[in-house]
Amino acid sequence: MATLQSLADLGQANKAALGTAENEAPVHVQKLDAHGRAYATGKRKDAVARVWIKPGSGVITVNDRPVETYFARPVLRMILQQPLQVANRADQYDIVVTVTGGGLSGQAGAVRHGLAKALTHYEPELRSPLKREGFLTRDPRVVERKKYGRKKARRSFQFSKR
């Protein structure tokens, strides 16, 4: 019985010590590398984007090419500019991106996700507006696998009665 009593006392002492920090929100601090850049990884479908941002004039480079040549369609450029517009930080950061996998739409979504995360690493106070718009959430939708006995994931083979 004496051991149970002492273990209970130990548990209560531990709860008392940790009880104050238990309900507090985590404090987000600025995370920069040795070159003064913020780094983040974004994902969408099969695409993975690695994003570095630093203060600058608004130059965006994707896989060592200007964003206008890599993402030729204006809709794709608009997608990856969205976090900057929500945060009112357009033309304030130089952005370097390496993106692999997937198609152009998935890559643009991955860059948007990574850019939003990198902005929160550089300026933690931007976390709430970017989170409110859903840019910090990884989109879990991926392609459904093909099933055997079917032509595609859900499409059946053509059925003939006779």
UniProtKB/Swiss-Prot annotation:
Q: Gene3D superfamilies from the entry?
A: 3.30.230.10
Q: Which InterPro entries match?
A: Ribosomal_Su5_D2-typ_SF (IPR020568), Ribosomal_uS9 (IPR000754), Ribosomal_uS9_bac/plastid (IPR023035), Ribosomal_uS9_CS (IPR020574), Ribsml_uS5_D2-typ_fold_subgr (IPR014721)
- Xref: PROSITE patterns: RIBOSOMAL_S9
Which GO MF terms are attached to this record? RNA binding; structural constituent of ribosome
Tell me which GO cellular component terms the UniProt record holds.
cytosolic small ribosomal subunit
| GO BP terms | translation
- One Pfam family this chain carries? Ribosomal_S9
Q: Which UniProt keywords apply?
A: Ribonucleoprotein, Ribosomal protein
| HAMAP family with a match to the protein in the record | Ribosomal_uS9_B
What's the family?
Belongs to the universal ribosomal protein uS9 family.
Q: Would you tell me the protein name for this molecule?
A: Small ribosomal subunit protein uS9
State the gene name recorded for this protein.
rpsI
